[in-house]
Amino acid sequence: MSTRSRARKRSRVRSRTRRKDPIFVDGHRPRPMYVDYKDLELLSKMVNRQGRIMGRRKSGCTAASQHAVTAAIKRARFMALLPYVGE
């Protein structure tokens, strides 16, 4: 078989769409970066069904906001506002 007769597999180029950081307020980063541990609506979006903290790629957070979210989730777990283990 010649190389021309073979069908070439073309890799699909994905266009990355920027996810909006859920911590940002009106498109701007709050300074200082602080996530309230009592905001259970936001924190429950950052935790999956098993109770694990979602990674940056999945949640769309920047590094600074991911650190703040992680600290807030751990604080809320300690205060018994969020469960350590999910369903």
UniProtKB/Swiss-Prot annotation:
Keyword entries, A-Z: Ribonucleoprotein, Ribosomal protein, RNA-binding, rRNA-binding
Bias type Basic residues, positions: 1-19
Domain of life: Bacteria
Any single biological process term in GO: translation
GO CC aspect terms: cytosolic small ribosomal subunit
Gene3D superfamilies: Ribosomal protein S18 (4.10.640.10)
GO MF terms, alphabetically ordered: small ribosomal subunit rRNA binding; structural constituent of ribosome
Protein's UniProt keywords contain Transmembrane helix: no
Keyword Membrane: no
Annotated segments matching region Disordered: 1-25
UniProt cross-references to InterPro entries, sorted A to Z: Ribosomal_bS18, Ribosomal_bS18_sf
Subunit annotation: Part of the 30S ribosomal subunit. Forms a tight heterodimer with protein bS6.
Functional summary from the UniProt entry: Binds as a heterodimer with protein bS6 to the central domain of the 16S rRNA, where it helps stabilize the platform of the 30S subunit.
Family named by the database record: Belongs to the bacterial ribosomal protein bS18 family.
NCBIfam families noted in UniProt: S18
Protein name as it appears in the record: Small ribosomal subunit protein bS18
Lineage summary: Bacteria, Pseudomonadati, Planctomycetota, Planctomycetia, Pirellulales
Record gene name: rpsR
